[in-house]
Design a protein with these regions (language model features):
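Active-site anion-handling motifs in enzyme catalytic cores
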Residues: 1-145
Length: 145
C-alpha cells in the first residue's frame, strides 16, 4: 500500500515492531529523503505533529493517530488544525491498524475531511511574511505571490 506512517520519535521502535511491512518514515533522516518518502505516499498516518505539518506542506493528506506511547492532551495538534481550518478531532478515535492499508478513497468521507488543510498554506505564509518584524528578502516574497 502507498500509505506512510510517520511516528513520533518515541513511537518509532513500537511502530517498526508492530508494522514491519509498512512504509515507516523516520523524520530523523536527511530531509531530502524524508520529503521524497512523504511525496511517494497516497496519504500519511502520523503520531507526530511534525509529520502532519511536513505532509501538508507538500499537499499530502495526513491524519493524526494518537497511540499510547506519547502523552499529549492534543492542544498542539488542535492549535495547528485551527490555523489551517481542519475540524478539531481526537487522534485516539482512529486506530492505525484499521486504517493503514486502505486506499485514500476507501477511507470514510469524515476521515478524508480531516486530512488536508481547508485554508491555503500559501495564504498563511503570505500573511506571516506580511507582518514579519524583520526584512524579508524579495526572492522569498516572490515565491508566495
Amino acid at each position: 500500500c502507498k500509505v506512510g506512517i510517520i511516528p513520533h520519535l518515541r513511537d518509532l521502535p513500537h511502530i517498526l515492531r508492530d508494522f514491519p511491512n509498512s512504509k515507516v518514515i523516520n523524520l530523523g533522516k536527511k530531509i531530502e529523503e524524508v520529503i521524497d518518502e512523504i511525496n511517494s505516499c497516497e496519504y500519511i498516518l502520523s503520531t507526530s505533529l511534525h509529520g502532519i505539518i511536513v505532509a501538508h506542506a507538500y499537499g499530502i493528506p495526513a491524519l493524526w493517530i494518537k497511540r499510547g506511547y506519547i502523552f499529549t492532551d492534543g492542544l498542539k495538534f488542535n492549535d495547528y488544525f485551527a490555523s489551517v481550518e481542519i475540524p478539531l478531532y481526537d487522534g485516539s478515535k482512529y486506530n492505525l491498524e484499521d486504517i493503514v492499508c486502505k486506499s485514500f478513497h476507501e477511507l470514510s468521507s469524515e476521515i478524508r475531511s480531516l486530512m488536508l488543510p481547508h485554508k491555503s498554506v500559501i495564504e498563511l505564509q503570505r500573511d506571516l511574511l506580511r507582518v514579519a518584524p524583520f526584512e524579508v528578502k524579495q526572492s522569498i516574497l516572490d515565491k508566495v505571490q
